[in-house]
Amino acid sequence: MSRTAFFISDGTGITAETLGRSLLAQFEGVDLTLVVKPYIDTLEKAHDLAAIIAQTADRDGERPIVIDTIVDQSIRDIIAAAPGFKVDIFSTFLAPLEEELATHSTYTVGRTHAIGRDDVYMHRIDAVHFALDNDDGARTHQYDQADVILVGVSRCGKTPTSLYLALQFGIRAANYPLTEDDLDEDGVLNMPKALAPYRHKLFALTIDPRRLAAIRSERRPNSRYCSMDQCMQELQQAEALFRRYHIPYIDTTRFSIEEISTRMIAETHLTRRFSPR
């Protein structure tokens, strides 16, 4: 089964897309084409979009799914008249909340992104700068300022996880790659000197060797770096290090960056400086 889903908003569309994706992810047997339409904030834009929804229904032979967070009632009415299956997130939840809280909603466009905006912005920028400055073991002298230090072999997901933690939660995440330089004379991977004072901040990532080899092949094909033997050896040594020093770790093979991050936060009890956008 193939369907089209529209995520529509009079703001950035982040809320509609995030909630919509979460809902639609529950239907694994449906092949979905996802369309994001932000800033539908005028009647003209609403009419144009309604026409697109109608064209999509004709083309697919099925009415598209329409998930929106539009505040303006006149714009909502235009979208509602289009031939789509409408999931109005705000109207679904605001009415019962108004009743429970005994007060009326302000129905303000972009309100979710305005709450504490200046403070959130500064935390986000600070955390992103920190993640970039401390990527791949670049500045180990700043580890005392880190909320968490991600460790693992090259290409196991440390950098994207660090940036996601910074962008979504304002967490100052550094990351350190475990390499052959950290082997002792007997070929055993030891705790790197730069990390030893911060063992309480360490969280490790590992990955299936076949997946790691595939990822590395995209970067350096036909090299020792991406060979299965090399990947298996590095991962075995890294996981032995994690166990020896009781460093918590997660296998990233089957998890998205979002899942890796939230699982890590739950396990380490890191403090979020703000909630996701």
From Swiss-Prot:
Q: Name one Pfam family in it.
A: Kinase-PPPase
> InterPro entries, alphabetically?
Kinase-pyrophosphorylase, PSRP
Q: Where does ADP bind?
A: 152-159
Q: Which UniProt keywords apply?
A: Kinase, Nucleotide-binding, Serine/threonine-protein kinase, Transferase
- GO MF assignments: ADP binding; ATP binding; phosphotransferase activity, phosphate group as acceptor; protein serine/threonine kinase activity
Catalytic activity field: [pyruvate, water dikinase] + ADP = [pyruvate, water dikinase]-phosphate + AMP + H(+); [pyruvate, water dikinase]-phosphate + phosphate + H(+) = [pyruvate, water dikinase] + diphosphate
EC number(s) in its UniProt entry? 2.7.11.33, 2.7.4.28
Q: What class of enzyme is it?
A: transferase
Please, which domain of life does this record's source organism belong to?
Answer: Bacteria
The protein's job, in short, is: Bifunctional serine/threonine kinase and phosphorylase involved in the regulation of the phosphoenolpyruvate synthase (PEPS) by catalyzing its phosphorylation/dephosphorylation.
The family line of this record is: Belongs to the pyruvate, phosphate/water dikinase regulatory protein family. PSRP subfamily.
Q: What is this protein called?
A: Putative phosphoenolpyruvate synthase regulatory protein
Q: Which organism is it from?
A: Chromohalobacter salexigens (strain ATCC BAA-138 / DSM 3043 / CIP 106854 / NCIMB 13768 / 1H11)
Classification lineage: Bacteria, Pseudomonadati, Pseudomonadota, Gammaproteobacteria, Oceanospirillales
